[in-house]
Amino acid sequence: MAKLTALTLLGLGLALFDGQKSSFQTRFNVHREVTPVELPNCNLVKGIDNGSEDLEILPNGLAFISAGLKYPGIMSFDPDKPGKILLMDLNEKDPVVLELSITGSTFDLSSFNPHGISTFTDEDNIVYLMVVNHPDSKSTVELFKFQEKEKSLLHLKTIRHKLLPSVNDIVAVGPEHFYATNDHYFIDPYLKSWEMHLGLAWSFVTYYSPNDVRVVAEGFDFANGINISPDGKYVYIAELLAHKIHVYEKHANWTLTPLKSLDFNTLVDNISVDPVTGDLWVGCHPNGMRIFYYDPKNPPASEVLRIQDILSKEPKVTVAYAENGTVLQGSTVAAVYKGKMLVGTVFHKALYCELSQAN
């Protein structure tokens, strides 16, 4: 009887292991290879070598870029150097990056580790930049005021909250108001690792304001990018390891109601929204295994999706760019401005391309 019990337990354990292995391979898309999709004129951005994880382009063509992210389990080519915020003027013929100086007596530059970013412009045209920061592997949101003439950021405030335990990305909806994705439920790195590998789908989205903080969506397998429609009525959330983008209706009281989901054959990361057309531009990881288990001989590929008419019954999804990692490794974000596209990566370079007429 004891042997039968042991054999049964062994069989259940092996079945569980096989099921978990199969689930892991599916979630990380380990067998995916990309079919190249080229654009007519692409150039690597000089001065970006250690990541450009998120970016946002203002209506006037100024682009903010978060650079130098150190994320647990992800490659970093310069792990001891603090991160920074870069600026590009996309109106220039050959735009270059400029590091924005950061002022503010209480801000610690030495531990700056920027992740997702978002901007908010008020009625007086003051631009506020919100930056997800991971000082010493913690999660904060840093609020800055952009000083265009000085080419600097004035640090205004550091935001911490128990419902912001593992922030990945944010979308600003006011000067101190935002939605934030938490890519994990746990804070401890060991528990985070188990959470991700077991596919617990415990990550969630938080609404934050100075007087009201609450969970507004949950049950995600690594909630990642988040953005909002130009009219402010819909919120888009990328679920990285489920390969989905969710559309939520936003209500006047800031609650979110699920509307629809789109499935993809790629790991969807950050979402940019064209303010004119409403199209979504999504930085993606075709094969997640190569991001989380880096091999320089077999680097992670890059892929950019364009989603048109996402609210319709049949949204149009186009691969705008795809490359096997020879040029650009680990794309996380893409945004467009006047026929040009800027693509960022989690730990590698950035690419600036002309869009073809088909796009």
Swiss-Prot record:
Transmembrane segments: none annotated. It comes from Oryctolagus cuniculus. The preferential association of PON1 with HDL is mediated in part by its signal peptide, by binding phospholipids directly, rather than binding apo AI. The retained signal peptide may allow transfer of the protein between phospholipid surfaces. This is Serum paraoxonase/arylesterase 1. Its cofactor is Ca(2+). Its main location: secreted. Disulfide bonds join C42-C353. The active site is at H115. Glycosylated. The signal sequence is not cleaved. Glycans are attached at N50, N253, N270, N324. Plasma. Associated with HDL. Homodimer. Interacts with CLU. Pfam families: Arylesterase. InterPro entries: 6-blade_b-propeller_TolB-like, Arylesterase, Paraoxonase1, Serum_paraoxonase/arylesterase.
